[in-house]
């Protein structure tokens, strides 16, 4: 957070200016006393109007009158957070039991499985999840037979599923008819019975998945794969081994130093292959890992500003990708320099790191040097694994770099062409899994991931993972090791919605909420954890509605949002975060800044944070945040069915004329009553359900329904006994009332038909702001440059209803009005000229040539002006209307500001800033490379030739179909990015400000006056047309940004904790299998055919783009 509070000028300084230079016209500028008298009169008129027309006191009387219909219950924060934490523990524990059953069965079945080289025709029966996406696909591969399940719509999965079958997904670059795949399909079919049994024991289970180390994924229940017609080129790029949950479950955390050879021989195609390979390698790392990339020739250096290992989060990996994309090749190779540099950095324990697997990844075209003395010096005990990658087409002896890997418990890989990158940069996880397998039951610990986006469109989920080991003849005796392979990872999903149900919020008031964090400080649960959907860029109009949860099958990264980025950071929150990570319990009350729901405003409020650990899980702690006015809540006790029926009658659309246009918050009132985005439809369904089954039905949340009925009755009485009996009040376009229970009434009916606010009152920005303010809150409509004048809908004025029941403060509702802008302007103009003056400078005449009079709200948005051309800009940020004056208001402390970053945004390709350290979404090869068909043609031609010359004698058991990663579609998709937005707010108790805006050759006198009991200021200033000044716009709205400098952020990393256990070495490990001729290389004819397909796809894409 960046806050600006420049020193304010005093009234004395302003008076001195007036004496020295005088105003720009011959007539005197109105005195501060005169202006204040105008403002006081306007403020009195506005507050009286809002108070009288809204019926705020009348609603208080109604709540006090009917106290027999409700009780006031306490929100015991400590008790609530403890109960919720235990419920979450129980939920995750139940899911863990399902995982254990699956993992044990998988190991047992695979151990009993007899490997077969041949299968009879159609012997292996399974449902391929991608069958429905490719109607031209053959019904079956040799040895297999396809199942065609009958699917039904399922509300829990939000898609069609079949509980009778499991589905299989096989990556595009894996041949489905290969012997390995057929054997995998054969033995994993036994998991289907366990899947079904788990669901019988717990019908709320979501996806159950086994991800094989070979890339096959079997998941239950069966469901067609996502519609890849949404993806450019219709290429399915999913590989279970690259999903966040698989990466986390397959190996312990890693400290990785990637060492890149940039000598002169590494040039052209080889350098491009290395860049892509490093980028793919970075994608195999998660937030528990640490990484850096260094390059070397005759000298060694870091490729980026990072001078030590950094956390492998999304932002840091982007920095490294961009840096790698800019490396150049020159000089000669000195492996000693490179490895010395790598070991020194990798063994630096003075910085934050994973403190587990220590790895050096060498990417080179080969060489004659072995650097034995460096390994003898730094790695005598072989605690650091070295993996080597021979990249490109060359004639070097592979012996030296293969020796490096074999002598240092690593593995040697060859990447001769594009198609080998994807597989060979992820297979090192199998090697890191060896110590886990050898550790046996000690390593079989359920781990829970960060939040990420489910590939099958379930939304935001977390996944419990458990490694599955190959126990086939694992030990014949204590010393004769037979197997140390990881078969894969078992996963069970938990939807974030399931966790939210355990943290009920509808008694907390809209500004109360739960949140949970993991040991990295990332939030699992938080109202601001709302990533924007890929495919939706920065909106031209910032809607008040909260972003929907995202279903994006392309998302590979976890959705990582630090608690201190989810809220406005301060020292107390840093302390709370640290204590939560340490698993402590605690409570703290303090005053803090709060960003509004629509992210345009900053308010101040008292909050009490109460937190407790969530034991037995990977999530450190759960917290409950309550404002002072949420310590108690209303619990309705409408037991008589007659009263229930009378109140529900007021919700029927037929009664809108009498009761006002009514909106019902789309909540889960009953299990058989599904919320709808169509308000009228939902109201009809709600009333029909209540009439048929009564509010006391066992399938309903009785407290929720009774509260909504109570609010319906109270608000209807406000309409019937007060609003409807008032005569039409000039300047009032509408009246409204919004309640905690979920009722919104707008009167008259016609005004409700144009109501644009969120029917879910707990997510309504103006409602939440009103609760945190004691004043009347004026809210400007959203300005739309391309749309009609926003002012036509009126200015919203709202006020929280405060009641005290037995000394207990409650704010159960907000009332308000919408006022007509033209009437307001007319009224103020009359007010400002009641005392006639002699010249044009001394009042606020309509469309004055020399004087601008404006009213701004506490966010700096325009609400009223004496100029018609300003009127059409009502709702616009004033820094875009009169930027020089707005800057000056900041400089003299009328406004303070907060700059915040949104790490969950998406932007158009190329929209992100190009300068700075790597916050452009990096794809390697670059987009320019992708679109240059010559590069791909060269790559494919060399690859085909090399495969022909080198691979004839090394047919691969697992045949591959060459396919590049997401680089194909990068230039045609939205990209994740960082955006920044600045909120302005009052942070000064002074009521009046005066001064002179110096524009160099001229100046403008101004006076600012706050309107008491509101969130408004009045500004009278000499017209900007009389004195040209700085016209650079001051932007408040969301815009793309580099974000905080990552080079600075890694110097002071935030507090975190890694996993408690580490499996990085085992004395029984057999590391003689370290690559070489035993490696699995692509089949010749498969590679040749797919390389031509690759060329055709890319050239076709390029042709379409042209």
From Swiss-Prot:
Tissue: Skeletal muscle.
Cellular location(s): Membrane; Cell membrane
Gene Ontology molecular function: any one: calcium channel regulator activity
Binding of a divalent metal cation, residues: 261, 263, 265
Residue ranges, Extracellular side: 27-1076
Keyword annotations: Calcium, Calcium channel, Calcium transport, Cell membrane, Disulfide bond, Glycoprotein, Ion channel, Ion transport, Membrane, Metal-binding, Phosphoprotein, Signal, Transmembrane, Transmembrane helix, Transport, Voltage-gated channel
PTM: Proteolytically processed into subunits alpha-2-1 and delta-1 that are disulfide-linked.
Entry note about domains: The MIDAS-like motif in the VWFA domain binds divalent metal cations and is required to promote trafficking of the alpha-1 (CACNA1) subunit to the plasma membrane by an integrin-like switch.
Family, as annotated: Belongs to the calcium channel subunit alpha-2/delta family.
Protein name: Voltage-dependent calcium channel subunit alpha-2/delta-1
Species, as recorded: Oryctolagus cuniculus (Rabbit)
Gene that this sequence comes from: CACNA2D1
